[in-house]
From Swiss-Prot:
Keyword Transmembrane: no
Job of this protein: DNA helicase which participates in several chromatin remodeling complexes, including the SWR1 and the INO80 complexes. The SWR1 complex mediates the ATP-dependent exchange of histone H2A for the H2A variant HZT1 leading to transcriptional regulation of selected genes by chromatin remodeling. The INO80 complex remodels chromatin by shifting nucleosomes and is involved in DNA repair. Also involved in pre-rRNA processing.
Originating species: Encephalitozoon cuniculi (strain GB-M1) (Microsporidian parasite)
Compartments, record wording: Nucleus
Name this polypeptide is given: RuvB-like protein 1
Lineage: Eukaryota, Fungi, Fungi incertae sedis, Microsporidia, Unikaryonidae
InterPro entries with a match to the protein in the record: AAA+_ATPase (IPR003593), NA-bd_OB-fold (IPR012340), P-loop_NTPase (IPR027417), RuvB-like (IPR027238), RuvB-like_C (IPR041048), RuvBL1/2_DNA/RNA_bd_dom (IPR042487), TIP49_P-loop (IPR010339)
Entry EC number(s): 3.6.4.12
Length: 426
């Protein structure tokens, strides 16, 4: 079965398009045009990587369709998966269930990663024998109940027989662990992880394509250093709501469908726990990036909160985006401000200006979007299509690409004219 996936509007952007010295260069998967803005964004990326940008704010300003979000996506791609990047819109803070500042606080803590280093006792080896003993369930005739489990693990040095708790059967069954698999069992938590198939069974006939791994060396019981990466918000949620499988926990989740609001006291407990790991040298903080699009949708209360956050020592880099000039500040009784932002917050922000794309840049953007979505078009149709981006808008043209794909094959001028007549620009 072929899996289909939606193509995101900025899926063609995979980098900022900078060389090793930070100068803008043309790349087939980079942000198009906007050389000065790309160079400025490269400096932001470098400062985030070296943890010198924490607790600072940047505003990307420019007209509609000029590439503000594309620039933010380029920053995210340059930072990579190791640095958290959270994206939200200014209108997302308004809710009947949760306070505006709570939504912002949650997004901020999603953007801060904690890498915790922990020493764990683990059993690791190849499964030589797996024996499951079941018994009749006294409450019903079906299904049978797991009474006990035994497993023999082998390394290059020794073998060891282990007795496992019946509650671990679900993990074994879910991962389809059988003889010949190399597994990893944590002593304290009871987590079982299948690492792969032993290389000793590479020549066996098997319908499933397994990953083959060497037989572990040394003793079966060993102490390993495990790195775990979680955000502060993940730690908050783990402490805020029960995650057990008992009946009381399930009933609590059914009766509490509302979004859980995390208290300041709980966040303080999480911060103290993380600080303890930091003082012992068992953890490190990785400040990430929070991107807030349409920042002019926030109100005075949100701006005051963000102003305080920027001054705090534990804060990610905040990137705003706005297409407004002088605009009313929400919640201020009609007071005007640049980009709809209060002056106190604006004084602490550095601004990256994005200009309207020239026709040649629009032509290249449309070409890449067509390639990304697999649309073919003859030269006359392409010239006419690019002309629509000038007479109407670039966003309008990009929104027509999925519609033109319904014609199949190579799209002609007549096809473009038909779609343009049916669907109008705002």
């Amino acid at each position: 079965m072929v899996k289909s996936s939606n193509i995101a509007i900025h899926s063609h952007v995979r980098s900022l398009g900078l060389d090793d010295c930070g100068n803008p260069v043309e790349k087939p998967d980079a942000v198009i045009g906007q050389e000065n803005a790309r160079e400025a964004a490269g400096l932001i990326v470098e400062m985030v990587r070296t943890k010198r940008m924490s607790g600072r704010a940047v505003l990307i300003s420019g007209p509609v369709g000029s590439g503000k979000t594309a620039l933010a996506v380029g920053i995210s791609e340059e930072l990579g998966a190791g640095t958290p990047f959270t994206s939200m819109s200014g209108s997302e803070v308004y809710s009947n269930e949760v306070k505006k500042t709570e939504v912002l606080e949650e997004a901020l803590r999603r953007s801060i990663l904690v890498r915790m280093r922990e020493l764990k006792d683990v059993y690791e080896g190849e499964v030589v024998e797996l024996r499951i003993v079941d018994e009749e369930n006294p409450l019903s005739s079906y299904p049978k109940r797991i009474k006990e489990m035994f497993v023999i693990l082998k390394t290059s040095k020794e073998s060891k027989k282990l007795k496992l708790a019946p509650s671990l059967y679900e993990q074994i069954d879910k991962q389809r662990i059988v003889n010949g698999d190399v597994v990893y069992i944590e002593v304290n938590s009871g987590v079982i992880k299948k690492l792969g198939r032993s290389e000793a069974h590479m020549n066996d006939f098997d319908l499933e394509a397994d990953t083959y791994v060497p037989i572990p060396k040394g003793e079966v019981l060993k102490r390993k250093e495990v790195m775990q990466s979680v955000t502060l918000h993940d730690l908050d949620m783990a402490n805020a709501r029960p995650s057990g499988q008992d009946m009381l926990s399930l009933v609590f989740r059914i009766l509490s469908p509302r979004k859980t609001e995390i208290t300041e006291r709980l966040r303080g407990d999480v911060n103290r726990m993380v600080n303890g790991y930091l003082e012992n040298g068992n953890a490190e903080i990785v400040p990430g990036v929070l991107f807030i699009d349409e920042v002019h949708m926030l109100d005075v209360e949100c701006f005051t909160f963000l102003h305080k956050v920027i001054e705090s020592p534990l804060s990610p880099t905040i990137i705003f985006a706005s297409n407004k000039g002088m605009a009313p500040i929400k919640g201020s009784d009609g007071l005007l401000g640049p980009f709809g932002i209060t002056k106190d917050l604006l004084d602490r922000i550095v601004i990256i200006s994005v200009k309207r794309n020239p026709d040649e840049a629009n032509r290249e953007i449309i070409r890449r979007r067509m390639k990304e979505e697999g649309l073919e078009m003859d030269d006359d149709a392409f010239g006419f299509f690019v002309g629509l981006s000038t007479s109407r808008s670039l966003r309008y043209c990009i929104s027509l690409i999925p519609l033109l794909k319904t014609y199949g094959g190579c799209v002609s001028v007549r096809n473009v004219e038909e779609v343009a007549e049916l669907f109008h620009d705002s």
